[in-house]
Amino acid sequence: MKRIPEPFRIKMVENIRMTNREDREKALIEAGYNPFLLPSEDVYIDLLTDSGTGAMSDRQWAGLMMGDEAYAGSRNYYHLCDQVKKLIGYPFTIPTHQGRGAEQILFPCLIAKKQKAGGAKNPVFISNFHFDTTAAHVEMNGAKAINVVTPKAFDTVAYYDWKGDFDLDQLKATIAEYGADNVVSIITTVTCNSSGGQPISMSNMREVYRIAQQHNIPVVIDSARFCENAWFIKQREPGYSDKSIKEIILEMYQYGDMLTMSAKKDPMVNIGGLCCFRTDEDLFNDVRIRCVPMEGFVTYGGLAGRDMEALAIGLEEGMNEDFLTYRIGQVEYLGERLRAGGIPIQYPTGGHAVFVDAKILLPHIPAEQFPAQALNNALYLEAGIRSVEIGSLLLGRDPQTGKQKPSPLELLRLTIPRRVYTNDHMDYIADALISLKSRAEEIKGLTFTYEPPVLRHFVARLKPIE
């Protein structure tokens, strides 16, 4: 991809502080060798997540001043609903404080609806790949999360356009194995974060929806990075090069019945989420009832009016093709620099992050010693860069057996916040990892000193294995 400059001017800056290695060693020990627990002031470049860490535009900042903080019926809520209907095509909208808020009010209602119809005796959700909080909400509601992403996603070296696709044969086999009556929902994750921020093709989304309709299974589109997915469809899928991003998005959402969204990603707000419905007004009403005690009144869902206004504006800004070309190009630039330096990554790069294959880079560290987390710590010590593990540590234990779930990949995610860092930062990141590669065999595995029972990677404490 041709490297292009940022399609924006910088109006405000935030100073960041470089620390020395001695300071970082002390900070990492205090954090229990878990970068999630590091204070942000001890981090030079923060690649932990792209969720809520982007820079808002001048229009979004102006929108904050238009906040209507009425408890009920805020005008910003109605603006948000109008934007969702116009841009996504769904007429029923519930705002939430973030994506997991949408999941916590939706999933119990989906299970209850299935059980009311006589099904879901052994409830399961099927996805191309559940992300961590999504799987946690499934399991906390007594259901099982099953991933059926294409096997091509697990060959990080080989190029394939659609490493976020469902394995359609495996999807059909899973429905047959558990019985359609037990499948509460199919969750289409766009883009597929856990396989490397990889896109799912329109043809795959269409076929998944056709299979779901055959079995009367509702489809939820997990929509955190829907704009990036639409950009990949425009670039790679035959028949879409002449369509606008907005046209592609409207078609994508015809292959779902409802959506959950962490609006902290593509819509570029610091807080916010959505739970929206295409036709099922009865389910919408059930979820709204649950929203009130869990998230807040139905016209604010845990958000201030000003935050809903920024979200309504950001929904459209995130669809800007020039911005998406720059944004995904920056991720690709970092990926190509790393590949040129001999760092194994999930190839091709996805939309929001570069995923380093720690299993290849650190073959001496077994999965049960969390190689990607070990690399995460080493990168922080090397250069003050915080990233995040996507592998065995994140995947966790089977809630029924207590055994570690086998992770097909051990990835270190270098997540690029939107409109925050320049390509000079990307060069610094690449130089640090390439330098670290020459000493990779010195990196040691990790073991727990404290392991939480749910979503352990957030607050676990570890120590190096000597």
Curated annotation (Swiss-Prot):
Pathway: Amino-acid degradation; L-tryptophan degradation via pyruvate pathway; indole and pyruvate from L-tryptophan: step 1/1. CDD domains: Tnase_like. Its EC number is 4.1.99.1. Pfam families: Beta_elim_lyase. Keywords: Lyase, Pyridoxal phosphate, Tryptophan catabolism. NCBIfam families: PRK13238.1, tnaA_trp_ase. PANTHER family: BETA-ELIMINATING LYASE-LIKE PROTEIN-RELATED (PTHR32325), TRYPTOPHANASE (PTHR32325:SF4). HAMAP family: Tryptophanase (MF_00544). This is Tryptophanase. It comes from Yersinia enterocolitica serotype O:8 / biotype 1B (strain NCTC 13174 / 8081). The gene is tnaA.
